[in-house]
């Protein structure tokens, strides 16, 4: 039968004293050391959340731009000039007209006296074409500006017919008179009861013009 020698009281006291020396001072014997307490003091390997070695102290994740690319206050510079708030710019760089804003009327049809009249609109088209094109000779380089002026003049004259809740779409076909034949055709998806169109033509020895206005009721 094997026998085991029991440690003496003096050996037990020395063992307990050695364990107490290994624990940090001021902590009870049953306290486990935290991660901060066991971390070695002094420079060591960088942690996972720390910065990468070799980077400048001013470098951070939220401020990746450095040098002259950073504006005042650490803001990132924009890619280009920002247009004023509320303005619209086309792809060609020219400003666009702002859309008309009207309060809802909660009506499904025009009010009395505000219905579309094709006869009155046609007279307005004929007057605009005669005023703008009388005595004008066709010039290919100036045709675009002339058509734009015609559309603006037609839009202004038709608006004078008391049509507050109609959207107007103006189209003008302009070309030289060289003995050719031209057919201008238009198709639209609309309400046949309240919407409508008007068309007028103009010719002189140098040019011809066909103007069309589509009027769509805006509920």
Curated annotation (Swiss-Prot):
Tagged with keyword Phosphoprotein: yes
Keyword Phosphoprotein: yes
GO MF terms held by the record: protein phosphatase 1 binding
Composition-biased stretches (Basic and acidic residues): 9-20
Pfam families assigned to the protein according to its UniProt record, in alphabetical order: Tctex-1
Chief subcellular location: other
Modification sites for Phosphoserine: 64
Keywords assigned: Cell projection, Cilium, Cytoplasm, Cytoplasmic vesicle, Cytoskeleton, Flagellum, Nucleus, Phosphoprotein
GO cellular component, one term: nucleus
Region (Disordered): 1-84
CDD domains assigned to the protein according to its UniProt record, in alphabetical order: DLC-like_TCTEX1D4
Subcellular compartments: Cell projection, Cilium, Flagellum; Cytoplasmic vesicle, Secretory vesicle, Acrosome; Cytoplasm, Cytoskeleton, Cilium axoneme; Cytoplasm
Binding partners and assembly: Interacts with ENG/endoglin, TGFBR2 and TGFBR3. Interacts with PPP1CC.
Family: Belongs to the dynein light chain Tctex-type family.
Name of the molecule in the record: Dynein light chain Tctex-type 4
Species of provenance: Mus musculus
